[in-house]
Regions:
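NAD(P)+-binding Rossmann beta1-loop-alpha1 motif at the extreme N-terminus of oxidoreductases
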Residues: 1-53, 57, 178-181
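A general structural signal for well-ordered alpha-helical segments in protein cores
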Residues: 12, 39, 62, 74, ...
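Short, well-ordered alpha-helices that flank and scaffold nucleotide-derived cofactor binding pockets
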Residues: 13, 17-21, 44, 79, ...
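Rossmann-like NAD(P)(H) cofactor-binding subdomain of soluble oxidoreductases
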Residues: 15-17, 38, 49-129, 133
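Small-residue helix-packing motif on alpha-helices
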Residues: 29, 58, 74, 185-193, ...
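Internal alpha-helical scaffold of NAD(P)-dependent oxidoreductase catalytic cores
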Residues: 100-110, 125-159, 163-207, 248-253
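NAD(P)-dependent Rossmann-like dehydrogenase/reductase catalytic/cofactor-binding core
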Residues: 194, 198-255
Length: 255
């Protein structure tokens, strides 16, 4: 199978790295020359990579097409492109809905929306997919944990929570800087904080079939440090601000 990517940003790079490290049998991966730095690094990584300077040529030479541009660019370029009737189109574009994708591509079927995140490069993390499809799910199962969604409105909730990626990294950065300012070396501070949150996340995943509230309760002792920390953050409105922000993101997606 030959696959092509319209857009050569960080997500495209992450997805391709995941593909190259997986057991997927892909004969050719075609990318745009638009981001020369990323496309050149990808070409050096594998002989399967072909770099073209024309989006239409990418479409013409691919069985599956992945749309990985910003919404602004998508609205501009998609109506100008001609897709093949037998092509599978998978959009990573956050705010272009299915009705517009169908209009822009002049396709009524074989169009999907997926939400890959950068950890897909190491074949980790959830990949929400709408609508459900056996072949597309099988593809993404090689790259992470596919979560099939039954309707587009529900998928917007996953887009909203995926926006917590940068805030999560900012949390790690803030705590690492705090340790550094207390005299810990930068490398040790970052190693400690990232290792801590990896361990906490893995523990949460193992226990994800249970109510996550139990993890909150079990990580505290009466008058202990964790009890103090979670109570102070609650009083400051830290957790309520998460709900407020995800609601704000959801409102934007529904426009």
């Amino acid at each position: 199978m030959k696959i092509g990517f319209i857009g050569t940003g960080h997500i495209t790079k992450s997805v391709i790295h995941g593909i190259l490290g997986s057991k997927l049998k892909i004969r050719r991966i075609i990318v745009s020359k638009r981001n020369n730095k990323i496309s050149s690094s990808l070409k050096r990584k594998s002989k399967k990579i072909l770099v073209l300077n024309n989006n239409q040529k990418i479409i013409n030479n691919s069985n599956w097409i992945f749309l990985s541009v910003t919404p602004e660019v998508g609205h501009k370029i998609l109506p100008e492109l001609k897709f093949k009737k037998n092509q599978t189109i998978i959009s990573f574009i956050s705010t272009i809905k299915m009705k517009d994708l169908k209009k822009y591509t002049n396709m009524k079927s074989k169009i999907f929306r997926a939400i890959p995140l950068p950890p897909i490069s190491i074949r980790k993390g959830p990949i929400p997919l709408y609508p459900p499809n056996k072949s597309v799910k099988k593809f993404f199962d090689h790259l992470g944990t596919t979560v099939e969604i039954q309707n587009e409105n529900l998928s917007l909730n996953f887009w909203s929570t995926s926006s917590m990626m940068a805030p999560f990294y900012e949390l790690l950065n803030t705590l690492s800087i705090w340790l550094y300012q207390k005299g810990i070396s930068k490398s040790d501070a970052q190693k400690y904080i990232t290792s801590l949150f990896i361990a906490l996340s893995e523990d949460a995943k193992i226990n994800s079939k249970n109510d996550l509230k139990s993890l909150v309760q079990n990580s505290q002792t009466p008058k202990g440090l964790n009890e103090q920390a979670v109570n102070e953050l609650r009083k400051s409105g830290f957790y309520k601000s998460l709900n407020k922000t995800t609601n704000s993101i959801l409102k934007r997606l529904k426009k």
